[in-house]
A protein has these predicted regions:
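N-terminal accessory targeting/assembly segments
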Residues: 1-103
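Short beta-strands and strand-coil junctions in structured, solvent-facing domains, enriched
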Residues: 15-16, 38-39, 50, 60-61, ...
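Conserved "cap/hinge" positions at secondary-structure junctions
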Residues: 19, 33, 70-71, 90, ...
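Short, compositionally biased
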Residues: 43-49, 80-91, 142-166, 184-199
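Short histidine-centered loop motifs in beta-beta connectors
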Residues: 54, 59, 118-128, 159-167
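P-loop NTPase nucleotide-binding/switch module
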Residues: 99-133, 137-142, 146-152, 169-229, ...
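P-loop NTPase catalytic core
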Residues: 221-222, 228-551, 564
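C-terminal amphipathic alpha-helical interaction region
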Residues: 539-585
Length: 585
């Protein structure tokens, strides 16, 4: 029997309910406002009172209204049919909702329970299985979707029967398993899992050792993101966070992409809805939307559901990781999620931390980021969840609590600089403030030595030194004037400008330059480094700037040319001739 309660107090979207039985922290309940049934979550229990956070507007709610407790936490539905769907933060399918605006209390099925799937068994009668073991597979879009023993089942089981290959609904029984006491369990293709708990059906979680290719030079070459790693992109408004995330989601070397639009403007999400069904994935030749799930909680949707949306996205990511797939989860922006936590904490009158954020903000963010990672499954296969979040610090202040807390948890830091954005140097990733701690991992160094070239990390650090020395030279030139410093200072500055213009800047709206494969990045980077290592016979700063501007122009044309085309090779030859003319004899 369900536990019931009555509304005893209302503080904006927090409702205090008087309860007639036991309720648990994070339990889901429904608050009734007339005929409307609104989902809510228990966030605090004190004696016979439960503080519940309502995922909708509480307008019209009054003292004495009914509250019904469900006895379980907020759960995600995991089954074939998730790919290419658009959800809200509570996994309601947005396509099934009617009307221009989302009505209060709207709840829709996350998947089509009547759809049929071509099932192919992988397990046999008599096999010993445990939670997360693969029983069979169905083809979802072009991904082989594994049907697994529900994660909630503990201990070992024996397969008593499994259906033959054929067409089935997700709700049909596809296998029967027995436990050690001979109790039978009917298994279907659908299972549920609480979003706030990590799925831990794996044997080990090794450190990331492979690099995830994104096609963005400033990331892949300078600060690589590891497969199963974590990164975040802080930056002020208008610095290009969303465009950079969209570029990565289009080009990343991943099997499944999950985009969580958490409190962002609705028009940015509409862009994804409009673009992704049209775009083709160059790796597979399929539409990008076929490997993408969008969880959309825009800024005009209930604030409380923002927190749920990031957890729902991560849970779906962990589900696909358990199939041995590479998953990329992107949240834009985690600052809005932190603001939802702050609002909740303030309404509960908890002790505030810095900037009124909750005291445990750092622990909450670290706990969430730790759910990403590379895992070794029970059957020996590997899967990964790579997480990339954006942070929108107020006024571009990178010392505020959300950025500081995220910095402790994430291994890659891609700081977007307002000055680079203002001077149209996109992507505006600051080459000196940004870092990737994966460059320090021996496993990643080995991988880069093997897959790109020997001593690649040393070459990356050399490039960073060139940029640093160029900045110092520029400061001197600005103070003393063009004539007040030796030509070597100008040369040093222009070498850093060359590296910046050719490697760090990229056109996300050009069909060729938007996606730069690793092989091409290696060739271009080595070419630029080779030029930067040489000394040139330049009489004065005017000749120096003319020479390097010409080089930058030719390299830019190369970036816009098809890889290894006649045009590309032509520009390469022109660069070599120009450099040979000016080399110091």
């Amino acid at each position: 029997m369900k536990t019931l309660g009555r509304v005893n107090g209302i503080i904006s979207n927090i409702v205090i309910a008087k309860v007639d039985g036991a309720v648990a922290q994070n339990e889901i309940c429904y608050v009734y406002c007339g005929e409307t049934r609104m989902m809510a979550e228990v966030i605090k229990v004190m004696g016979d009172e439960a503080y519940v956070q309502v995922y909708d507007s509480t307008r019209g709610l009054k003292i004495g209204d009914k509250v019904e407790f469900e006895g379980h936490m907020l759960e995600a539905t995991l089954a074939p049919g998730l790919l290419s769907r658009n959800y809200d933060g509570l996994q309601n399918d947005l396509e099934k909702m009617e009307g221009l605006f989302i009505n209060r209390g709207s709840i829709t099925d996350p998947i089509d329970f009547d759809a049929t799937w071509e099932f192919k068994p992988l397990a046999k009668v008599g096999d010993k299985v445990s939670a997360g073991a693969w029983l069979g597979e169905v083809k979802e879009q072009w991904v082989m979707h594994k049907i697994m023993v529900p994660f909630i089942m503990q201990g070992n089981y024996t397969v008593k029967s499994i259906v033959a290959a054929g067409t089935y609904k997700v709700t049909d029984t596809i296998a029967v398993v027995t436990d050690s006491d001979n109790n039978e369990y009917n298994l279907t293709m659908v299972q549920k899992w609480p979003v706030k708990q990590a799925i831990r059906c794996y044997t080990e979680k090794p450190r990331p050792s492979r690099v995830m290719e994104t096609g963005v030079r400033a990331i892949d070459t300078f600060n690589p993101l590891a497969e199963g790693g974590t990164g975040f992109i802080p930056g002020p408004f208008g610095a290009g966070k969303t465009v950079l995330q969209h570029a990565i989601s289009k080009q990343a070397d991943a099997d499944v992409i999950i985009i969580v639009a958490c409190g962002e403007r609705a028009n940015e999400v509409v862009e994804i809805f409009a673009e992704f069904p049209e775009l083709v994935d160059p790796r597979t030749g399929h539409k990008l939307m076929e490997r993408t799930i969008i969880i959309c909680n825009t800024s005009n949707m209930p604030v409380a559901a923002r927190e749920a949306s990031v957890y729902t996205g991560m849970t779906i990511g962990e589900y696909y990781r358990s199939m041995g797939l590479k998953v990329l989860v992107m949240a834009d922006s985690t600052s809005r999620w932190a603001q939802a936590l702050r609002e909740m904490s303030n309404r509960l009158e908890e002790l505030p931390g810095q900037d009124a954020f909750p005291m445990d903000l750092s622990a909450v963010i670290s706990n969430f980021y730790s759910r990403a990672g590379l895992v070794k499954l029970n059957n020996g296969a590997t899967g990964s969840v790579t997480f990339l979040g954006t942070v929108s610090p107020a006024g571009g202040n990178l010392k505020e609590p959300v950025t500081e807390s995220t910095k402790k948890a994430a291994r890659c830091f891609y700081a977007l600089s307002q000055s680079r954005a203002d001077s149209k140097r996109y992507p505006a990733i600051d080459p000196l403030d940004s870092y990737s701690k994966y460059l320090e991992y021996p496993e990643v160094r080995e991988y880069l030595d093997e897959h790109i070239e020997k001593n690649w990390v040393d070459a990356v650090y050399e490039g960073k030194t060139i940029v640093q020395r160029g900045k110092e030279a520029n400061d001197q030139i600005n103070i003393l004037g063009d004539d007040g410093v030796p030509v070597e200072y100008h040369e040093r500055f222009w070498k850093s400008e060359l590296l910046d213009s050719v490697i760090l800047q990229q056109d996300a709206f050009d069909s060729i330059d938007a996606n730069c494969p690793i092989e091409r990045q290696k060739m271009m980077y080595n070419m630029v480094l080779g030029i930067c290592r040489n000394s040139y016979d330049l009489a004065d700063f005017e000749e120096c700037s003319k020479f390097f501007k010409e080089l930058i122009y030719l390299f830019r044309q190369m970036n816009y040319s098809e890889w290894k085309s006649e045009q590309f090779d032509g520009f390469k030859l022109k660069i070599e001739n120009l450099v040979n003319e000016k080399l110091e004899k």
